[in-house]
Amino acid sequence: MSTEAFENFFFDVCTFDYSKFNPGMQNLQTRMQNADKIHIKGDDTDLRFSIKDIGAVACGGTHNIPDGEVFSCPIKDSVHGHIQFNAPTIYRGTDFDGIRLEFKDGKIVDAIANSDASTEALNEILDSDGGARYIGEFAIGFNPYVVQPMRDILFDEKIGGSFHFTPGQCYDDASNGNDSQVHWDMVKIQRPDYGGGEIYFDDELIRKDGEFVVNDLIPLNPDQLLK
């Protein structure tokens, strides 16, 4: 991205009218607060977990700019399945790409990246302490101006059509009790140009290929937010 392109992008995300996230964002928060079983499907991804009674927090520009996510957290031992992330990430100064995690009873039991060196570094981080192999956050991103990963998590976790799944420390206001020095937001984009994917709440399809498909959440889709 050129300097001029970044300037335009930065001004767009900073001057966006964040009040447009309401009421769709509040509806998503309510759905997450009331949900039990989450099922996420996509390219080399099939995850199941529960967020029952964990709570959910809406982030609509009050504390961060850019913003645009609602987060919760899986019950610690409820995560099963696997996920292939498709957004690059930097953690502790190291660049990672192609991270794939496999879960059993909430714990990451297999973790690889796109090279032997990256896989070794990834597992060193996940072995930092007893909580680093458990998930501390699940969040859905919907900022219409943030569309491509740029290796800056303040931006990348808000990518429209994405979600992130976070090994390590949970937040107090959506807590599953997991404690760790690690909090590593890993992003998967589910738009068609990134392989698509689906998110289900209690067997109801909520989002398909990055677009919300239930009436009360459609206001969070880019074509609605950018009107």
Outline where the language-model segments fall.
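Active-site lining segments that contact anionic ligands and/or coordinate catalytic metals
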Residues: 80, 96-98, 105, 133-137, ...
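Dual-mode signal for accessory low-complexity, basic/Gly-rich regions
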Residues: 110-179
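Extended hydrophobic packing segments that form well-structured cores
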Residues: 182-227
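Active-site bordering "gate/hinge" segments
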Residues: 1-80, 215-216, 220-222, 226-227
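Long, well-ordered mid-to-C-terminal structural blocks that present hydrophobic/aromatic surfaces
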Residues: 75-127
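Short acidic-glycine loop/turn motifs at beta-strand connectors
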Residues: 43-44, 53, 103-105, 201-204
